């Protein structure tokens, strides 16, 4: 089963908004002024997730804008997962409001459809929320099914009839086919899931790399990935932190301040997970909304925020041409090692200096832990910053990335 808790939880909090076109939107002042979610009344006017608020207002003049309440979302997600736990312990979260459930071993409670319907009714009765569910023989099609009928509905995709049911759907409906992949597929006349399923392996690998083979496997119903238990902790593969600034960044000094601020959180998470970074990756989006990414290895794996910031900034300075101001910056620690893993030193890194910096950063972190994060900070960060007000919600996705 794949369960999708609808954004109606926001409506549940504000009953006065029922039956009105409503969109949950980010802060305009902090440059998150886009539609994060919308109800079906708003969708009927053509309002879509990801578009700017002004665009949504053009489509629906009476659109009611509400701010997101992440704490409430997490609360209801936790309550819903508590209900799921009555039926199975194989509950794999997928973001804040979606889960996969494996009810293969719950046959005494009924068929997959019957269990899904009982969960749907229970969540509606106990929490006042509607959910949509997909029931299928693998995770990919269960996810697809949960998106096919909304709200308060169940869709079954069976092994002997999935071709007739879903191969006519757009390839972009399939998990793993994002906008960039869809654009490549479309340029070669591959528009539906069925057309993707029939495309040759060599062609897909040539155009999309190994991801092309993965999505073809998905299209043919061959996904065999298991649903993890509710207590399963996914291995951490990378740790990142990104931000959209309140105003565009216009010079290297401003980018340095943002990167230095971002890596403080990354360093804390590396220590919490007892990891060291063997590489750094950065993603830069300009004010034309064009994104470029670069990455490099680090000579000696480290947890030092200062060293990570210097490496990230050097990578940026080497590659970014300043054709446009910058709107958002993301830094990721990649190629992670266990912190007690034996390390082969290279000939070029000043090991003593790095060790001294790591001990200094560890001491600074202890001070912040005891007296608050602003008790001590880099002098350059005391100047006026273009960073938005902090709002932190940590989510662990199935990829193992924390951010």
Feature-to-residue mapping (PLM):
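DNA-contacting surface of Y-family translesion DNA polymerases
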Residues: 181-326
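C-terminal hydrophobic structural anchor segments
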Residues: 313-370
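Short small-residue beta-strand/loop micro-motif enriched in glycine and branched aliphatics
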Residues: 64-65, 290-294, 341-342
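Gly/Gly-Pro- and Ser/Thr-rich, intrinsically disordered tail segments characteristic of DNA damage-repair
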Residues: 7-10, 14-217, 227-230, 268, ...
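Short, exposed "boundary/linker" segments that immediately precede the start
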Residues: 1-2, 6
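Residues at or immediately flanking beta-strands
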Residues: 130-132, 281, 328-330
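Short Gly/Ser/Thr- and Asp/Glu-enriched loop/turn motifs at secondary-structure junctions
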Residues: 94-98, 136-139, 275-279, 324-328
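Short, hydrophobic beta-strand segments
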Residues: 99-105, 293-296, 344-349
């Amino acid at each position: 089963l794949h369960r999708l808790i609808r954004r109606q939880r926001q409506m549940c909090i504000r009953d006065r908004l029922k039956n009105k076109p409503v969109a949950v939107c980010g802060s305009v002042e902090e440059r998150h002024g886009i539609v994060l979610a919308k109800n079906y009344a708003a969708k009927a006017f053509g309002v879509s997730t990801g578009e700017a608020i002004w665009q949504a207002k053009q489509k629906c003049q009476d659109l009611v804008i509400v701010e997101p309440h992440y704490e409430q979302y997490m609360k209801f997600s936790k309550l819903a997962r508590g209900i799921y736990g009555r039926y199975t312990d194989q509950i794999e979260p997928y973001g804040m409001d979606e889960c996969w459930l494996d009810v293969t071993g719950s046959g005494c409670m009924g068929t997959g459809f019957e269990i899904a319907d009982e969960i749907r009714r229970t969540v509606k009765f106990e929490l006042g929320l509607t959910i949509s569910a997909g029931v299928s023989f693998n995770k990919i099609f269960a996810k697809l099914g949960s998106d096919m009928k909304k709200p308060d509905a169940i869709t079954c995709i069976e092994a002997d009839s999935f071709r007739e049911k879903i191969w006519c759907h757009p390839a972009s409906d399939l998990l793993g086919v994002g906008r960039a992949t869809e654009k490549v597929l479309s340029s070669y006349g591959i528009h539906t899931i069925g057309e993707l399923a029939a495309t040759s392996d060599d062609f897909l690998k040539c155009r999309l790399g190994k991801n092309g083979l993965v999505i073809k496997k998905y299209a043919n119903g061959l996904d065999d990935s298991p649903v993890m238990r509710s207590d399963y902790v996914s291995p951490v593969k990378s740790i990142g932190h990104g931000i959209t600034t309140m105003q565009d960044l216009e010079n290297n000094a401003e980018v340095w301040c943002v990167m230095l601020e971002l890596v403080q959180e990354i360093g804390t998470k590396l220590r919490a997970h007892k990891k060291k970074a063997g590489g750094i990756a950065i993603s830069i989006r300009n004010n034309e909304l064009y994104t470029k990414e670069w990455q490099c290895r680090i000579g000696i794996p480290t947890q030092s925020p200062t060293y990570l910031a210097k490496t990230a900034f050097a990578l940026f300075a080497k590659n970014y041409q300043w054709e446009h101001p910058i709107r958002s910056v993301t830094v990721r620690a990649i190629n992670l090692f266990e912190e007690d893993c034996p390390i082969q030193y290279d000939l070029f890194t000043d090991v003593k200096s790095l060790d001294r910096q790591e001990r200094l950063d560890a001491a600074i972190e202890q001070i912040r832990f005891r007296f608050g994060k602003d008790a001590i900070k880099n002098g350059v960060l005391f100047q006026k910053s273009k960073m938005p007000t902090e709002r932190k919600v940590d989510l662990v996705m199935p990829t193992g990335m924390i951010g």
